[in-house]
Amino acid sequence: PWGESSLWRVSGLAKQPGNQFGRTETGKTPIIPADVQAKVFNYCEEVLAAAPEILNERDAGRLGFRNPALIRIRDAALYVLSITSGMRNEEAIGVESGSWRSEARDGVQFHWVATTEHKTGKGKVEFLIPELTVKVLDLMNRYAKPLQEKMALEVAELECNPTPQDLTNRMLRLAKAKRDVRKLFLCTSMSGQSESAGYHVDALSNGGSKVSFRRLAMAAGTDWQLAPHQCRKTYARNIVESRMGRSSLVFLKWQFKHSSMSMTQLYASNPMQDASLFDEVLEEMTNFKVDLIESWLGDQPLSGGA
């Protein structure tokens, strides 16, 4: 009943084909080194600064949806969102148009972006983001609009198609397109299409995000094996180091105005936040202290014994 797919792939339990897309991470998730963070973040800033002009070219019909310059915008925006929010990749690529908001409370400006948390089944959650990430999301709203419109047209065509031929695959595609039509991080895909039919619009997948991050790292001039899952842990470490008086260059660029608030106050500011992110920050606090103490101790036994 799953057409050309399978129960495991439809349910999201199957590994995607190809080692480069599979879940090959083993052991402890590495923290992105500070120099790599700086290189990648600065590169992303350059890409996003040039984005309005590139989008003007696209809107004028002089650039196609698959142009590398447009793909660089999407990749850079995904990295900035991930590293400044602490979202898991599935949550970041699930952000939809109009899902962010700002509010002032007791003289402090808060910016929130909502998405769906799948790992623990909590559902809708909100993440605290800096103002620069709001601007990136506004830019992505413009980036995604024509792709969303193309997907909406496909939805309408699928709904109006009365023929029984290939019905199962059409219904699966219709359900997926309806689910993804408001997402910001979209791509073009030939999956299931003939060359003559061209491409259709799809939501960026976890596998596609991994490829995007590796491409981003290479373009930024680093050989670090950058991966989406590293951003959440790196975000937690950046928060901890900031509060321990060791802010990185990147963190200083998007330092929250409410950084003097305690973690308890930050969590209490919005009950819809992802509590597990705060758990990871506390875990990194412990790791940081252990690393700090170990750095004080040399390799020589303190007793001086053999």
Regions found by a protein language model. Give the residues of each.
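Extended accessory and catalytic-adjacent subdomains in large enzymes
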Residues: 3-306
